[in-house]
């Protein structure tokens, strides 16, 4: 009985030992993680992202290192500037382990090392700058920190990707002064912008008034030109009308005289008839205010005979009678050239010179004034 119990205990110990051996001989390393393996206390190899077999009780995993980029934020550090002002600056460092073996064997804690190195480098960089330079040179400080840290941590198997200054806090008294200065600057800029706006508004208003006066002067000028041209053409047309009327009146009188003489010649009056007509006309002539006394000459009949001889010739009975004038004695009409000129007096067509003058005035009126605010209105005829 005791032997059976002892056998069971021994068997259980063997099973447990086998389980321990199997557990010690297998290591599963996930992706983006590296395992540093030692054999008998010395570095053996580095594995990542695989199932690794280990020699039990001989090989062991010294450390597991995360290969992803890490973001480490350090607490604010007091830093003294060149003008002896203390600033509290906190930084953020982005780094990645590239050589796991160096990160394990070259430094005991690379995170603490990065923090201390960042603080030291930050003090060296900011110590050579004034407060104003520190506040306005973040990119320059970040670049210097990254260059120094990347070079210093290279032997630790690290790669510094980026360094950022998260905040720069000056002392409370300096903050109050800065706030006052910022307020004064804002008020100054506001006053400058207000003055600039007022000046621009005044300039625009003056420019508008100037252009309005220019346009008004141009309009008055063109109106005066058109009025003068219209008056000139009106006078010309009136003169042409009066000339045409005088011509028509003279032509009518000439036609009347021509018809009268033609009628007289066609009637062939005798001296007795002319004497009778003269005597019939004497009472009407005597009614005038300037005609008081009329004397009939004794040789009146002889005078009529002489007048008749000029216009007629004696007939068979010895009496002078009027004869129609020959064709060549008839009044001749004016030449075609004169008729064409006279016909032009009665033409109602628009004078081309008037049309050209109006077109020129409209073109000048529509021409935009240099620097004007708009296009002048079109003048209509």
Curated annotation (Swiss-Prot):
InterPro entries: Band7/mec-2_domain, Band_7, Band_7/SPFH_dom_sf, Band_7/stomatin-like_CS, Stomatin_HflK_fam
Cellular component terms per the entry's GO annotation: extracellular region; peptidoglycan-based cell wall; plasma membrane
Organism of provenance: Mycobacterium tuberculosis (strain ATCC 25618 / H37Rv)
Keywords: Membrane, Transmembrane, Transmembrane helix
Annotated transmembrane regions: 3-23
Topological category with respect to the lipid bilayer: Single-pass membrane protein
Family statement: Belongs to the band 7/mec-2 family.
Pfam families: Band_7 (PF01145)
Keyword Ion transport among UniProt keywords: no
Classification via Gene3D superfamilies: Band 7 domain (3.30.479.30)
Localisation per UniProt entry: Membrane
Name recorded for this polypeptide: Uncharacterized protein Rv1488
Organism superkingdom: Bacteria
